[in-house]
Regions:
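N-terminal hydrophobic/helix-forming segments and targeting peptides
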Residues: 1-331
Length: 331
């Protein structure tokens, strides 16, 4: 599991430029599905056909895109001004090493003298080591994208840290589910959706959900925890198991799906916890409301330091998410 997760975290894929991630995952999931394609939006959609004469459609979703920065101006002194892609935690990202989709390295820096309390997008630039505009433009152009440079690392036997676990962890879970049920008879059609542009408005999942017309869905994404110093009160903690989402700021999950996941976790002795997130949202909401709608649920991966280069998860929680989803599909 870890090696697969590490492989997909190494691929550059900000919102709108997920094609490398999609191609990597398409190759990885090929042995475990009946068909796959990349749609017009850029979503990767794979399917395992069910054995039932009248199968229902089950949609499993993780988003491929990550937060990052897009070049919008090159200054005369060679500094590269950028705009954010997605919700950037500027304090966490300041003075971090970044790398572009073309392999150009640099450092994300705030204007000299800027206080952390005043951090804002227009106060940041990337220093790529160029001493003037001409030299900088040999390496970058308007529209190039940068991401935080941080490889996945094991802290101990269970906990890993790096980027972009939001949401390559969700993609990894969907892939591991496909592996687990590949040779098992499953009554329903299972659609594996690796969506695009979640970080900028849950866009890709809307078109994928419309095309599929699912009866039920499970979304896999990271969620915050309440177990760090000074964190807001929250029941979710790292190492507490798969987080069964009840609601967040964008969705109220289907009560039957929540109850079923809760029951299965108890019956199968899968470590779990319940999630009520007071901020943010995921593809769950867009899938739930697309077309005629569907019974939407989510299994979240507890994570610390989201939208930074040091996102942290527990691999036992990761495995619990996979185990719970597999048992849900079998029923």
């Amino acid at each position: 599991m870890y090696n697969t997760l590490k492989t997909i975290t190494l691929v550059h894929g900000v919102s709108g430029k997920e094609h490398r991630v999609a191609n990597t995952l398409k190759e990885m999931i090929a042995p475990y599905c009946d068909a796959s394609h990349i749609d017009a939006m850029g979503n990767l959609i794979a399917v395992k056909k069910g054995t039932s004469a009248n199968p229902k459609k089950v949609l499993l979703c993780g988003h491929m895109d990550e937060i990052g920065f897009i070049v919008n101006f090159v200054e005369d002194n060679g500094f590269v001004r950028v705009a954010p892609i997605g919700g950037i935690n500027w304090v966490a990202c300041a003075f971090g090493e970044v790398v572009s989709d073309k392999g150009v390295h640099g450092v994300l820096v705030p204007n000299s003298g800027t206080k952390a309390s005043d951090f804002a997008p227009d106060l940041f630039y990337i220093d790529i080591g160029a001493d003037n505009k001409k030299n900088a433009e040999r390496k970058v152009k308007i529209g190039d994208t940068f991401v935080l440079k941080s490889n996945l690392t094991k802290l101990n036997a269970n906990r890993v840290v790096g980027r972009p676990l939001d949401d390559r962890a969700g993609c990894g879970i969907v892939l591991e589910i496909a592996k687990r049920i590949a040779k098992e008879p499953v009554a329903d059609d299972v659609y594996y959706v690796f969506s695009v542009q979640e970080e900028v408005g849950c866009r890709g999942s809307k078109t994928a959900a419309f095309a599929i017309g699912a009866d039920v869905s499970l979304t896999f994404d990271v969620t915050g925890t309440g177990d760090t110093a000074g964190s807001k009160p929250m029941a979710v903690k790292l190492g507490g198991g798969a987080a069964i989402k009840i609601k967040d700021m964008s969705v109220i999950c289907d009560s039957e799906v929540v109850d079923k996941l809760t029951r299965i976790a108890k019956e199968k002795n899968i470590k779990s916890q319940h999630e009520i997130l007071a901020y943010g949202g995921t593809d769950t909401s867009s899938i739930q409301m697309t077309g005629a709608g569907c019974r939407a649920g989510a299994i979240s991966i507890p994570s610390r330091y989201i939208h930074s280069g040091v996102e942290m998860i527990d691999m036992n929680d990761y495995k619990a998410c996979i185990d719970l989803a597999v048992e849900f599909i079998k029923e």
